[in-house]
Amino acid sequence: MSENLKIYFAAPYSRAYVFAPGDQVLGKVVFDPKEDENVENIHVEFRGKYETRAGSGKEAKSFETTMFSIQKILFQGPFKMRASTYEYPFSFQFPKTFRFNPEVFDDDRLFPNEHRDGLQPLPPSCEDNGSHFSGNYRISYRITARIPRTFGDWSRETFLRFTPYRLELSPVPHPASSKDGRKHHRRYRLTDEGIPRPLTSNETLKEKFHHHAVNHTINFSLSASAPTAIVIGRPYAVELTLLSTDVETGHSAPEFQFSNYWLILNGRTIVRAPGIFITATSSLEEDITVGHGSIKCRLPLNKPLVVNGMFPSNPSYMPPSFSSFAVQRSYGLELKGTVSCLGEDSEFKIHWPRVTLYPARMEDGIEEAMKSIESSAQDMNLDDQSGLPAYEK
């Protein structure tokens, strides 16, 4: 990488921008030699590359393919360039598809392929973040500027974020309920004024051996409803319900409070690489905390409480749910929360095993796109919550 060679993108594009199929990639290469230099040429390459490694030890297999490579000459020499600043604009367009022969994989049962003519949709940019996994993957899109030199080229490389459009309403963004199956309880007594209070240490010890009639017990569990189709950056509401049948006894129940929470996406990635006799496959998992905080709000029994703000309002890039010929990405959702009662905390964990992360741009269109999907889903009376993103064929 050379310090006197840089890549800049035209507004509104930046390294954080999320490109989509057919988007223009506009920018410029800036060459800033500190002294006179002989330059053969200056060229720029726009390339999409797909790399996977699966298995371990002697069974490990690697696979890579260049989805596309577009090169342009920005300056043609040879020419002796004086110490100054030179700017060369470039323009590329993201392809919508690329040609690939899926027959290199001998088994399509895991990754069913609908594009038998060899035209594949571009998959979203993503990569394995750790070397400790048994498999690795990287789907990358990059702009590389280069000046050939006898003893090592000058170059500068910038990676771009890319995600395809979602074109089908499956799954629709309907919420789904789930609950922590564990039962929790609190023992308490009522004061002379009828106010619940925790048992003292001595009362708790005696209760273990013999139940006292003035002691009360309340059993409770937590249920939650959350969206199963998600765009990071859209402010979804989560509905919490503290469940208990003991309030029907007529005794005064203690007050509960929902305090700390963690909202986590459970990312699951299946990676494969072809071999001579067998295709190697690896499964990777990672937990991504998308929201956490402290709410400190009263949680009524058997009545839903709608909580806003758990999902982040500022979008960040994450690969959407997708299935391609060598990488498959899916998600689950997990909510961890703390419920406090009479000075004691209970930890809850609620899990939705399958949610879908929608692709969306970071700058605009998230709210409009989701409202359109929600409206269309209601009109069509859709309630299917399975499936993966569909791409234009």
Outline where the language-model segments fall:
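C-terminal beta-sandwich interaction modules and adjacent acidic
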Residues: 1-393
